Amino acid sequence: MPCLLLDKMVAFATALRAAVVVVVRPVNIRCLAFYANAKHAYRITKPQSGTVGLHHEQQHPQQPQQQQRRYKSQFRFTLEGGTKLSASQRQFYEDNGYLVVRGLFEPRELQAFSKRFEEIACGRAKVPGLTVMRDIALKDAANPDKYVVNKLQDLFLDDQLWQYCIDPRVLDWAEAFVGPNQMAVHTMLINKPPDTGGLTSRHPLHQDLHYFPFRPADRIVCSWTAIERVVRENGCLVAVPGSHKGPLLEHEYPEWKDGVNKAYHGIKKFEQASERRVHLEMEPGDTVFFHPLLIHGSGANRSKGFRKAISCHYAASECEYIDVAGTSQEIIAKEVIEIAHRRGLPISDYSEAAH
C-alpha cells in the first residue's frame, strides 16, 4: 500500500515540468523519493534515515548518540536547548498542543503573499505544478479567479510564496518542536471565501497526522500565519486543547448536505463537548504552531470578505515513512493514488519504483 503524502505526490508527478530534480533510490526501510528545487539547491541529505523534504538551510549535524540524548527530556512535545520557547510557553504547548505567537510578522510583509495569490488565482502568473484548488460551491462560476480559488498548495514551486517557509523567524520557532534539521512537508496558502449559504467553507474537525504517512508525530509541527484578521465571523481556527495527547482517530468525509471540499476529511462520529473547544482569533502576522494530533478545524466564513492564511508543516529529518495498509490512513492513501493517476504518475506504491 502507498506510503505517500499529497504534496510529495504532486511534487513527484510534476517534477519534470517544474524544474525539480527527482531521485528515487532504495534504502533499507522502503523505497523513498527525494526531491530538491534545483534552482535553489536546497540540500537533501541523510538518506540513511529515509526522509523526504527540503531541509532548513542552516544545518546542525549531530551524531546519532547526540540526537538521542537531545530527545531525552522531561518534556515530550518540545526539545531542549537553542529554542525561543520560554518556560511558560513550553509548558503551554506541552499541555495544550498549540502555541500562538503574536506579531511574528509585520502585517505589511504579508501583503506580498496576498498579492502573489491574486496573481496566480487570476491567471496573471503561471506556476507549473502548483496545486490550485477551488471551493466546491464556487468552482463552476463563470470567472475562476480569486473569488473561486480557496487554496494553493506546493508553495515550494513558487519563489515568492516559498519565502514564508524558509523565513528564519518561522524556522527558529519550528526548531523548538522538530529540531534543527527540518523538512517542509506540506505547504498551503488558504483563501477561505465568504460562504454561499451551504456552509461548504467549513473545515471539519480533523488531525493533520491523518494526511502524513511518517513518524514520529511528536517531531512534526504546523506553522499557520494569519495574513488577514481572523475571527469567529470569518471562520477562525477552532481547536480542542490537549487532544494532541490522544491517538490518531479514524477520518472520513462528513455527510454535509451541500457537499464537502476535496480531501476535507473529518474525524468519524466525533462528539467532543463544545465547551472544550477554543477559538483562535488572530491579527495579521500572528502565528500559531500546533501538533499534528491536535484536533482542529474551522467554521464557515459568515463575513463578506476573504480570510487568508499561509502555512507550512515541518518535520524532523529523522522521520521515517510507515506503511498505512490496514490503518485508518488507508482511505487518504487511496485518494492520493487516484490524484497521482490523474496527474500522470503511473504507480500505485512507492515500492514499485524501487524495481
Segments predicted by a language model, with ranges:
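Fe(II)/2-oxoglutarate
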Residues: M1-N96, Q111, A354-H355
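Non-heme Fe(II)-dependent double-stranded beta-helix
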Residues: T45, Q68-D95, R102-L205, F212-F214, ...
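Non-heme Fe(II)/2-oxoglutarate
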Residues: Q68-L79, V127-L130, D135, N143, ...
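Double-stranded beta-helix
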Residues: Q91, V230-I295
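Short helix-to-loop capping/linker segments positioned immediately adjacent to catalytic or ligand/cofactor-binding
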Residues: D159, W173, L209-P213, A226-E228, ...
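A short beta-loop-beta micro-motif enriched in histidine and acidic residues
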Residues: G179, D208-I220, E275-R276, M282, ...
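Short, structured patches in soluble enzyme cores that scaffold and shape functional sites
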Residues: M188-N191, Q207-L209, T225-R229, P241
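Short, conserved beta-strand element in jelly-roll/cupin
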Residues: P213-R232, E281-P284, F289, H313-S317
